Amino acid sequence: MKADIHPVYEAIDATCSCGNVIKTRSTLAAPLSLDVCNECHPFYTGKQKMLDVGGRVDKFKSRFGAFGATKAK
């Protein structure tokens, strides 16, 4: 590798919303915040969990859901 062209690779803490702290290394010098990790993800825990993240479909339904709700006969 060439000297002085690569970014600094530092140790950082990635904190999950459940409180789990993961130590990792990154070129990003600031701590990271994660939504899910292996301690709280439904795939790893086997529990169904509703995440508080609304997608584009939910946003569309909340704005335009009432327009197609009733059908005139």
Curated annotation (Swiss-Prot):
GO terms for biological process: translation. InterPro entries: Ribosomal_bL28/bL31-like_sf, Ribosomal_bL31, Ribosomal_bL31_A, Ribosomal_bL31_sf. Coiled coil: none annotated. Zn(2+) binds at C16, C18, C37, C40. One of its GO terms (cellular component) is ribosome. GO terms for molecular function: metal ion binding; rRNA binding; structural constituent of ribosome. Its cofactor is Zn(2+). Keywords: Metal-binding, Ribonucleoprotein, Ribosomal protein, RNA-binding, rRNA-binding, Zinc. Binds 1 zinc ion per subunit. Binds the 23S rRNA. PANTHER family: 50S RIBOSOMAL PROTEIN L31, CHLOROPLASTIC, LARGE RIBOSOMAL SUBUNIT PROTEIN BL31A. Belongs to the bacterial ribosomal protein bL31 family. Type A subfamily. Part of the 50S ribosomal subunit. This is Large ribosomal subunit protein bL31. It comes from Pseudomonas syringae pv. syringae (strain B728a). The gene is rpmE.
